[in-house]
Amino acid sequence: MEDPIKAIEEIFKKADQIFKFLDVKVINLEKGRAVVEIPYKEEFTRRGGVLHGGIIMSAIDITGGLAALTVNDAMDQVTQELKINFLEPMYKGPFTIEGKVLRKGSTVIVVEIEFKDADGKLGAKAIGSWYILRTKVQAK
């Protein structure tokens, strides 16, 4: 029997280019929680070898979406709002990102996400909301 976490990871790598670009590894998925890891890569950095804020934000968005997915009983979801505080420069990978569902309503799922370096230092903290889609949305 195939590992369900690996199966989800493969589906996202095929369907989501940013997931593939960031080389996301899904560490854990359970109801209301997702943990992923991304590597340190030079192409992810800005001056001084510090991880670029856009990379951190993208990884947080992916992780929050995966956490929301674990409680979503509908067809799909989209990021509605994402607020982040960058707390420390990040330069020591791999980086661990953990999302925890705070509340699932009928139309919105609220998730808290933390971004940490290889030593467990908290580099960013975010809160976001994912809008629940009851019908599948396709790009035109």
Curated annotation (Swiss-Prot):
UniProt keyword annotations, A-Z: Hydrolase
GO molecular function annotations of the record: fatty acyl-CoA hydrolase activity
InterPro entries: ACOT13, HotDog_dom_sf, PAAI_dom, Thioestr_dom
Tagged with keyword Hydrolase: yes
Disulfide bonds: none
Superkingdom of this protein's organism: Archaea
Spans traversing the lipid bilayer: none
Homology family: Belongs to the thioesterase PaaI family.
Protein name, entry field: Putative esterase SSO2140
Organism of provenance: Saccharolobus solfataricus (strain ATCC 35092 / DSM 1617 / JCM 11322 / P2) (Sulfolobus solfataricus)
